[in-house]
Amino acid sequence: MASFEIKGGHRLHGEITPQGAKNEALQVICAVLLTNEKVVIENVPDIRDVNKLIELLMLIGVKVKCTYQDENERTFEFQADQVNMEALRSPEFATQATALRGSIMLVGPLLSRFGWAIVPQPGGDKIGRRRLDTHFIGMEQMGAKVTYHYSRYEVSALSEDGTSKHKNLKGTYLLLDEASVTGTANLIMAATMAEGETTIMNAACEPYVYQLCHMLNHMGAQIRGLGSNLLHIHGVRKLRGCNHRLLPDMIEVGSFIGMAAMTQSDITIKNVQVEHLGLIPQVFRRLGIEVWQQGDDLFIPAQEHYKIERFMDGSIMHIADAPWPGFTPDLISIALVAAIQAKGSVLIHQKMFESRLFFVDKLIDMGAQIILCDPHRATVIGLDHEHALRGVRMTSPDIRAGVALLIAALSANGVSRIDNIEQIDRGYQHIDERLRALGADIRRIE
């Protein structure tokens, strides 16, 4: 198990470019299964979760070719013209798919194109209960039969003669009980080649979902309502290949903003596509962090101090996650850690997952003033850089908490060690190398 050793207290300086969006990559890579033609995807991040998904596709017979545009940008060519559906039943597929929560999004495209799919109960971050009902209830409403036994889901829309030529997948009206991003993506892909029109109400409208719909339309799908929570998908008989480029990862953008503030550093975040960042810059500005837009770049100047705003009636600032266009839950951990060295107090409310704030005990060990109110809420009393955090040894519990701990370690006095950094590698590309280029003292210990 690898670790990071970080000597904190160094101010950082320079430019950094966010990787391709992880959450978008997982969706659009699954979508290559919808066609037998070549699909080219640019700006694919070199991270564990994405690489595991690509390995899963190769395991079921998808042809994959990778080229490097430069040392940090990859382009992949996929062709799913010889998919081996029986490989879904193999122990190897079950083992690999279980380790990746994104594997659930294989179901939608396989169901749409081949009429059936099998996937094990997926894993992923241990951040609380993350149910899959939204996915499977929607598929059942479209005519599929879903069974769960021996820790795997079997979904079939085949007619009784068992041939994919007689699929019973029908367009229908779907009112989702939650605006699930992966659930929305799965149902969109399932609906692209269903018979008739599917309407999805309360659809997730994150930029990732917009990008997926945009790509599918280039492939020949007929999707209306892109970017809204009401989607109309008219099923087509066949989809074609296309070229698609991933957005910059907005979670990395937010992480770098928090890192710059905590380490009192000046950093330019390049090519962020500001129009897709939503409330992210605004929320960090509420913490007192200066975020300047320069064209399509964000510049975070070095600040000796930054002060958390209060609401207009004088009450304590409250930052909570919400479905898009609200503040993304993936940045709640970063907002929390950025508040540690601010002046003032803030209530952080993680509404969507009940275990994502449990990492704060490690920050308290480092000297942070945090009160964990309950599994969903924590109050941060800022230190205003009057006291530095101290280096400690800790373990990364999940992707986002791991990076929050890394940011804290970069700002701390002394040496910190973070174990289980495979969690960080799941979502952040070559993060140690990129931080060293900014002046961080960080090394990987295998």
Task: Label each residue range with its predicted role.
Residues 1-446:
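Short, structured segments at the rim of ligand-binding sites
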